Regions:
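Cysteine-centric redox/oxidoreductase cores and disulfide-bonded domains
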Residues: 76-155
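Extracytoplasmic thiol/disulfide redox context detector
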Residues: 1-82, 127, 143-155
Length: 155
């Protein structure tokens, strides 16, 4: 058992996330005294409910007033959420917009019986929203993959 644990620590401990191109999705004053960290899975209906119903009021009362900032981190619960998380990180200048769009329209892209079918829905959805992302290049990007996995491990 100890050998397996050491192997897992070595494997997961060696993930490199020091890529300057990848930024956390943070909303609010960077100097706010309170930091809210939200670990979310893009296929989780409760996470989507939080993002649509709770987050706007939280933003209005605490983030927009400068009292707090919120940092969205990835906690994919399945392969579809993992790929959607990678997509949300592909264009750092649009990450929050992509995240909002994925949660607001979760039922449009999350349905399907296979990962391939869901990926197809996700690809069509991203294109229909006007995001110019090379889907295959993005979901196969090792640095983005490591960034998302590191969030998952930390969470």
């Amino acid at each position: 058992m100890n050998k397996i644990f050491l192997i897992l620590v070595f494997f997961f401990g060696s993930i490199n996330i020091s890529n300057a191109e990848l930024n956390r999705i943070v909303v609010g004053n960077k100097d706010a005294k309170i930091t809210i960290i939200a670990y979310e899975s893009l296929t989780c209906s409760h996470c989507a409910d939080f993002h649509k119903d709770i987050y706007p009021q939280l933003k209005k009362d605490f983030i927009d007033t400068g009292l707090a900032k919120i940092e969205f981190r990835h906690f994919p619960l399945d392969v579809a959420a993992f790929n959607a998380s990678k997509i949300s990180q592909c264009k750092s200048n649009e990450s929050l917009k992509i995240l909002n769009s994925l949660y607001s329209n979760q039922q449009e892209w999350v349905r399907g019986n296979t990962v391939e079918e869901i990926n197809g829905n996700l690809k069509k959805f991203i294109k229909s929203q006007g995001f110019e992302i090379n889907f295959e290049k993005c979901i196969n990007n090792k640095e983005i993959e490591d960034f998302v996995l590191n969030d998952r491990i930390e969470g």
